[in-house]
């Protein structure tokens, strides 16, 4: 895959991970993404939470077949916040998202009281299962499709057991639950508020 930057600071890749990039935009900005489907099956990009036309929003009826391409073009009409994008093809959304085809879509705004830069941290939480060769395992049986399943490893930003050194400062955490079924209850390890 290739990411072609439209302007400085628009795309933040997550280093050493299988996840998609973090896209940073501003309200009113025009977005243009050329999606060339090189997957074994059809796919489509759903821009989760964005106010855009149905044709651009990645509905399964607009799935892009293998080898085909489509250009998503829209103007950001959302208020500043944290959104995400992921595939949404009929009946195979789960396996494609599980494989890492997802990323954050951040609409930036002027909030002088909120931390920015290194103090504005994305946290994409996922649970996954791996086989003996450290390859992702997606239980694709009927019960897993109906009820979902819980992985045995927690990943943060696509990496296991990661830690990030921090300064004694106020941080803004942009948390995305990218798991297929798991619900998280987050708390500080020392029990503080």
Regions found by a protein language model. Name each.
Residues 1-193:
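Histidine-centered copper-binding motifs that mark active-site loops
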